[in-house]
Swiss-Prot record:
It is an enzyme of class 2 (transferase). Residues 1392-1403 have a biased composition (Low complexity). Coiled coil: none annotated. Belongs to the RNA polymerase beta' chain family. It catalyses: RNA(n) + a ribonucleoside 5'-triphosphate = RNA(n+1) + diphosphate. GO terms for cellular component: DNA-directed RNA polymerase complex. This is DNA-directed RNA polymerase subunit beta'. One of its GO terms (biological process) is DNA-templated transcription. Its EC number is 2.7.7.6. It comes from Coxiella burnetii (strain Dugway 5J108-111). Zn(2+) 1 binds at C70, C72, C85, C88. DNA-dependent RNA polymerase catalyzes the transcription of DNA into RNA using the four ribonucleoside triphosphates as substrates. The RNAP catalytic core consists of 2 alpha, 1 beta, 1 beta' and 1 omega subunit. When a sigma factor is associated with the core the holoenzyme is formed, which can initiate transcription.
């Protein structure tokens, strides 16, 4: 018995560890792991099926095959444990040691490790400073290398071909040593003095000036210093001993029919052993050189194939013509060790089945089929049966359960009570894809799911399946109940809005009972209270939709949060009173007194959650659902073809549009408009027409005329089924209704361009063959896209999770002073996102002042909840500074003050919340949803008509910002700058609307004018870009040569001629140098200057420009000289969307990116090169910056214009790296957040900004060293921000110069691979490369992230595991401190003295005590 305890003790867990280190293994280390040398390639004996001795499965080396039984059977059972059998040499122990005991092979000749040779950059190559080709020539015996030149004039490391070697031998005899093969490389590596090399490189780096050399030296220095610091020896990259994997990890399994299935590794090992043994034999025989060499080369190839098959040369194929899986293949890729077995494992106690709807369940319940429950809860049932004495043994209990007697069902009921189960639906895109429920036993074989959680799971009941898991331990049950229960997940983690919201038929039911109808039965009745209304309705005295007057009791929350009751009379619809019956006290009646669309219901639940708490909300949501189902059934809403009402004006609208199109075709034929313009205009006409038809249809469908009580005709909202469904938000949208009863409109081709001829029919009328054919185009693309994009989106999510996985809230407050400024997001005059939504749930970084009284409204560090955001709105404050994830200075992770509200819970985020993963899921989840939804509108082109004017939406005053204008003769202003804005301020002076004013817009108001809502204040042509005169004078053409740089086009009808500039590509050689431009001169033919400067009024004309004026014409200020046609965009849906988001997060440099001004100053143009223009910016202090800009780029600044640093000079998509470099971190964050949000906003998806900020923070983790100062960092090295901070703190203590850095932006893939943790990086992508680099550097992984801890099988350092890790670290820290104190206290002589005294002392207890003190 004592032995047994000892045995169990010896098999306890491995010791606690804090970090993992990866290093190169020295030959000694490999031998120390090994339990014996594998000498034979045999695996098992074909007759006895026992492993061969000294073979690949040898029991003597690797351990016994059966538990506690040696191979020959002499020793069996536990009592002989630990004995080594003298007959077969096998140790008597557990068979599972065959999973952990390794062997080794002594190689007859050293072999290079392929990873350090071929994985780029080649480590061996860098160390030796020899090219990879040369190393391969040496290794594969094509050349000699001089190892020791001796007294000869050969260079060390010089390569000699066979002939050269023989010549050298003749010339110098044996004064020099030259070798080939891995021995040569090994010797070269052994001769490297790493320390001296590092010193030499550092000195050389300081003296060198050339860029390329610096780069090369830095690369070498990095690798060498890595070897120096890690204690790896270079020669260990050459193998002399090869470890052999334990046999149970490369099994040989007998199949039926006498054949064997074997792991590929066995084949690879066999080849190595065969070749090694043959080589040994040849060496013993002193075989001729050429044969030995060939054998050595074959051995090298065999080892290469074993380590990483296919990396060099052709891969070794197995019997069935497929590549053999090598050791490297075992760990990399989706089916490799990391992703298949370590990051995700299959779990026991789980089942799956089809789901069906459970409308009678409560929110916290799920229906579990009895059959499944019985199987899942088996162990619990067994123990209960034994406890009750119904069964004596497990076997008896098993029998009872199999017979399914009544006592078993009773016990199952008990076991299941309050034992939560987890339900999961694949794909689990965010954390709401797994939730906990209390099981309710149901008959049948399908799981019943509560309808309200379908949104969270994205589930429907068309055959979806779900998996059930049982949390076994008490802790697991507790977590499931308190954190994962569906009732605790009412809010969406991505945006903080309720996700337990009724949808579809429930909404339809609620909408139906809250509608009112003119002249319904019982209209105008008065009731004393709500109960009376219910009785009247039940006795058919009053209709659901009748307008009635009722006295209701209303409880409203006061400031203190108590409910104050009051009575009042309300005039409302009877159905709303029925709904009011179930509304909890504390909600105002106004929230119910309206048709309950989906938005209204969401608002109702949101208000309930914020004001009355979770419990009330959950109960209320359930009641709403029951009521919605009930009345949706009562309403009898359905769809018939007659519900699709086609408007009568449709024909007229369409024929009008056709006339317009014909008119434009005429203009095109006569050359008045270009091909591009014609196309744009036609598409615009049809887009507008489609909207008009849709509007007519909506007017027709949404309103019906009825007679009221007096017999007069009145209009009321229609009860048309389709209208009700789309209006309530239950199903369908205006866009879909438009296709059913309006016109289908323009279609897109698969490449996104729009087909000019629209489909004028709708689905009610039916499509003809041509229209149907055009439709299939877009529809089919939608289907193809869906398949591709689901994968894309999943991959994006994976990268996001990987980059953010180690970001956890680690402290309450980091104490930073940095912050970001928040403003409402305004686009084209619409406030797309008001300030309240952007700052809700954040922490103020600076106090907010009342703009009128200058009093402090809100203090610094205030948490902005709904109430405080209302205060901001009341005082119309439009910019505040708030804390942000980007500026947080927490050492690891982030602090809760910088993050703000936990969106899924509604309070400030708790320490330990894994916000990185939440952010990644919130951004990734809609990606998948959206991609799956491209095809729903059947590829109908929804291109917005191009904006061509500014119409003010609110009354107020005009302010013109950064706007340069010139005044035309008629008195209008014309904008001649690009970055100008027109702002509308309300009477309080707060900004309501912002509009970008494009170049060339005519503005009809002045700065400070008052405007009324609906007034048009600016106009322009959206399809062309004008060039406008800023001075009056006479035109002169320069370099405009007919037939060379320009062509005349004459309009036959009007006789007008216009001039078109030809593109440089089409010009003859002589014309390529010419730069067509127009200049303005005065009466004396002298150049005129632009106002306020010495810059001549020259206007360069890009290719494709239309000139409307002739040479010598007189022009006024603000006239249009020329027009540059603009091409239109393709349709943008999330297709453009998903790749766009990926590009932003990958920080890719866009093609033809915008060119930004590197410094602030005045623009001028210098001498051009062949195909590039030269733009010079001169700063006020006289420094200049030159920029070469390709000729075809449209430069948006003119000579003499002043630009600010970071302003756009040449149009194009902006490059995030430029923004970071020129405008700083905050501007970059702002740019990425807005760009990503725009993509999602187009799809109507709400994501809170802070999630995107969290990802951006991770992309900005690294900095580039610009000046290393006194630190050990290298120039231009990329280092973690925190590491630089640490190094600098050390230097400051010594009064040295600190390192200077600049932030750099890494794309999410790069950032994931550049993370400090090599385990996390290796399990993400490019496993081989990551592990190679890590092992050379002897990297240490502190296991700070979530992934690393999952991989080593620990609790994650987040959530409930956070405190466990904190305690563990604290204990570890304490023991280190104690050790240090001990070391400080006792000197060696003191210890010696104490020890001798202790030994002398007679009482042994004291001696023990003294030793303890030591």
């Amino acid at each position: 018995m004592r032995d047994l305890v000892k045995q169990l003790k010896s098999e306890k867990h491995t010791a606690e560890f804090d970090a993992l280190r990866i290093k190169l293994a020295s030959p000694e280390e490999v031998r120390s792991w090994s339990y014996g040398e594998v000498k034979k390639p045999e695996t098992i004996n074909y007759r006895t099926f026992k492993p061969e001795r000294e073979g690949l499965f040898c029991a003597k080396i690797f351990g016994p095959i059966k538990d506690y039984e040696c191979l020959c059977g002499k020793y069996k059972r536990l009592k002989h444990r630990g004995v080594i059998c003298e007959k077969c040499g096998v140790e008597v122990t557990l068979a599972k040691v065959r999973r952990e005991r390794m062997g080794h092979i002594e190689l007859a000749s050293p072999v290079a490790h392929i990873w350090y040779l071929k994985s780029l950059p080649s480590r061996i190559g860098l160390l030796l400073d020899v090219t990879l080709r040369d190393i391969e020539r040496i290794l594969y015996f094509e050349a000699y290398v001089v190892v020791d030149p001796g007294m000869t004039d050969l260079e060390p490391r010089q390569l000699l071909s066979e002939e050269a070697y023989l010549d050298a031998l003749e010339e110098y005899g044996d004064d020099f040593t030259a070798l080939m093969g891995a021995e040569a490389i090994q010797r070269l590596l052994r001769d490297i003095d790493v320390e001296a090399e590092v010193e030499a490189l550092r000195t050389e780096l300081q003296t060198t000036t050339s860029e390329t050399k610096t780069k090369k030296l830095t690369k070498r220095l990095k690798v060498l210093s890595a070897f120096l610091e890690s204690g790896n020896k270079p020669e260990w990259m050459i193998l002399t001993v090869l470890p052999v994997l334990p046999p149970d990890l490369r099994p040989l399994v007998p199949l039926d029919g006498g054949r064997f299935a074997t792991s590929d590794l066995n084949d690879l090992y066999r080849r190595v052993i065969n070749r090694n043994n043959r080589l040994k034999r040849l060496l013993d025989l002193n075989a001729p050189d050429i044969i030995v060499r060939n054998e050595k080369r074959m051995l090298q190839e065999a080892v290469d194939a074993l380590l990483d098959n296919g990396r060099r040369g052709r891969a070794i194929l197995g019997s069935n013509r497929r590549q053999l899986k090598s050791l490297a293949d075992m760990i990399k890729g989706k089916s490799g060790r990391f992703r298949q077995n370590l990051l995700g494992k299959r779990v026991d106690y789980s089942g799956r089945s089809v789901i069906v709807v459970g409308p009678t369940l409560k929110l916290h319940q799920a229906g579990l089929p009895k059959k499944m429950a019985l199987e899942l809860f088996k162990p619990f049932i067994f123990s209960k049966l034994q406890l009750r004495g119904l069964a004596t043994t497990v076997k008896a209990a098993k029998k009872l359960v199999e017979n399914e007697g009544p006592e078993v069902w009773d016990i199952l009921e008990e076991v299941i009570r309050e034992h939560p189960i987890l339900l999961n639906r694949a794909p689990t895109l965010h954390r709401l894809g797994i939730q906990a429920f209390e099981p309710v036993l149901v008959e049948g074989k399908a799981i019943q799911l509560h309808p309200l959680v379908c949104t969270a799971y994205n589930a429907d009941f068309d055959g979806d399946q779900m998996a059930v898991h049982v949390p076994l331990t008490l802790e697991a049950q507790l977590e499931a109940r308190s954190l994962m229960m569906s009732t605790n997940n009412v809010l969406h983690p991505a945006n903080g809005e309720p996700i337990i919201v009724p949808s579809q038929d429930v909404v339809l039911g609620l909408y139906y009972i809250t509608r009112d109808r003119v002249n319904a039965k019982g209209e105008g009745m008065r009731f004393a209270d709500a109960q009376e209304v219910v009785r009247a309705y039940e006795n058919d005295q009053v209709d659901l939709h009748a307008r009635i007057t009722v006295r209701i009791k209303e409880g409203i929350l006061n400031e203190a949060g108590e409910i104050e009751e009051s009575d009042r009379l309300v005039n409302t619809a009877a159905g709303r009173i029925l709904l009011w019956q179930i509304v909890p006290k504390g909600l105002p009646f106004a929230l119910v007194d309206q048709p309950m669309t989906k938005k209204a219901v969401t608002k109702l639940l949101d208000f309930c959650y914020r004001n009355l708490g979770l419990k009330t909300t959950v109960i209320f949501a359930d009641k709403l659902m029951y009521m919605g189902f009930h009345y949706a059934t009562h309403s009898g809403v359905s769809i018939g073809i007659n519900d699709l009402v086609v408007p009568d004006q449709k024909e007229a609208i369409i024929s009008r549009a056709e006339d317009e199109v014909r008119e434009i075709e005429k203009q095109y034929a006569s050359g008045l408009v270009t091909h591009g313009e014609r196309r744009n205009k036609v598409i615009d006409i049809w887009s507008r027409t489609n909207d008009q038809v849709a509007k007519a249809m909506m007017e027709k469908i949404a309103v019906e005329k009825v007679k009221d009580a007096e017999g007069k005709e009145v209009a009321q909202s229609s009860f048309n089924s389709i209208y009700m469904m789309s209006d309530s938000g239950a199903r369908g949208s205006a866009a879909q209704t438009r296709q059913l009863a309006g016109m289908r409109g323009l279609m897109a081709r698969p490449d996104g361009t729009i087909i000019e001829t629209p489909i004028t029919a709708n689905f009610r009328e039916g499509l003809n063959v041509l229209q149907y054919f055009i439709s299939t185009h877009g529809a089919r693309k939608g289907l193809a896209d869906t398949a591709l994009k689901t994968a894309n989106s999943g991959y994006l999510t994976r990268r996001l999770v990987d980059v953010a996985q180690d970001l956890v809230v680690t402290e309450h407050d980091c104490g930073t002073e940095a912050s970001i400024e928040m403003m409402p997001h305004i686009e084209g005059g619409d406030v797309v996102e008001p300030l309240r939504e952007r700052v809700l749930g954040r922490i103020l970084a600076e106090p907010v002042m009342d703009p009128k009284s200058r009093k402090e409204l809100l203090a610094k560090d205030t948490f902005l909840d709904e109430r405080r955001v209302d205060i901001l709105e009341e005082h119309s404050i439009d910019r505040v500074r708030v804390r942000s994830a980007i500026t947080c200075e927490a050492r690891y992770g982030i602090c809760s003050m910088c993050y703000g509200r936990d969106l899924a819970r509604g309070h400030v985020v708790n320490v330990g919340e894994a916000i990185g993963v939440v952010a990644a899921q919130s951004i990734g989840e809609p990606g998948t949803q959206l991609t799956m939804r491209t095809f729903h509108i059947g590829g109908a082109a929804s291109r917005a008509t191009a904006a061509n004017n500014i119409e003010v939406k609110s009354t107020g005053k005009i302010k013109l910002r950064n706007l340069k204008t010139v005044e035309q003769a008629q008195g209008n202003l014309v904008a001649v700058s690009r970055s100008g804005e027109l702002v509308v301020q309300d009477l309080q002076g707060s900004e309501r609307e912002h509009y970008k004013v494009p170049y060339g817009a005519t503005i009809s108001v002045r700065d400070g004018d008052s405007v009324k809502a609906g007034q048009i204040v600016a106009q322009w042509d959206p399809h062309t870009h004008p060039i406008i005169t800023e001075v009056a004078g006479t035109l002169r053409f320069v370099d405009l040569v007919d037939g060379v740089t320009m062509n005349r086009q004459t309009d036959e009808l009007t006789g007008l001629s216009s001039i078109v500039i030809t593109s440089t590509k089409q010009r003859s050689a002589s014309g390529k140098e010419l730069r067509p431009m127009v200049k303005l001169v005065d009466k004396n033919d002298d150049d005129l200057f632009l106002p306020g400067g010495k810059v001549p009024a020259h206007y360069f004309l890009p290719e494709g420009t239309f000139l409307t004026k002739e040479d010598g014409t007189t022009v006024n200020i603000g006239d249009v000289l020329a027009r540059i046609p603009q091409e239109t965009s393709k349709t943008r849906d999330i297709t453009g969307g998903l790749p766009r988001v990926a590009d932003l997060f990958e920080a890719r440099r866009p093609k033809d990116a915008a060119i930004l001004a590197e410094i602030s100053g005045v623009v001028s143009f210098g001498k051009d090169t062949k195909d590039k223009g030269r733009l010079i910016i001169t700063a006020p202090d006289g420094t200049t910056h030159e920029e070469l800009i390709p000729k075809w780029r449209h430069v948006s600044v003119f000579e003499g214009e002043t630009v600010e640093k970071g302003e756009v000079i040449a149009d194009g998509p902006r490059d995030p790296h430029d923004i970071l470099r020129l405008l700083g971190v905050n501007a970059l964050a702002n740019y990425i957040v807005n760009e990503v949000q725009e993509v999602y906003r187009l799809q109507g998806v709400k994501i809170n900004d802070k999630h995107i900020e969290v990802i951006v923070r991770q992309m900005l983790r690294k900095v580039k060293i610009t000046q290393p100062g006194d630190t050990d960092l290298l120039q231009n090295e990329q280092v973690e921000r925190t590491r630089v901070r640490e190094e600098n703190e050390k230097i400051i203590k010594k009064d040295g110069t600190v390192a200077k850095v600049e932030p750099i932006l890494l794309g999410i893939t790069k950032a994931s691979l550049a993370t400090e943790s090599f385990i996390s990086a290796a399990s993400f992508q490019e496993t081989t490369r990551v592990l190679t680099a890590a092992s050379v550097a002897g990297k240490r992984d502190d296991l700070r992230g979530l992934k690393e801890n999952v991989i080593v099988g620990r609790l994650i350092p987040a959530g409930t595991g956070f405190s466990y890790h904190q305690q563990r670290r604290a204990v570890a820290g304490k023991s280190v401190e104690e050790k240090e104190i001990e070391e400080k206290r006792v000197t060696a002589s003191e210890a010696e003295q104490a020890l001798s005294e202790a030994l002398k002392s007679s009482a042994p207890q004291e001696a023990k005590a003294a030793q303890k003190d030591e």
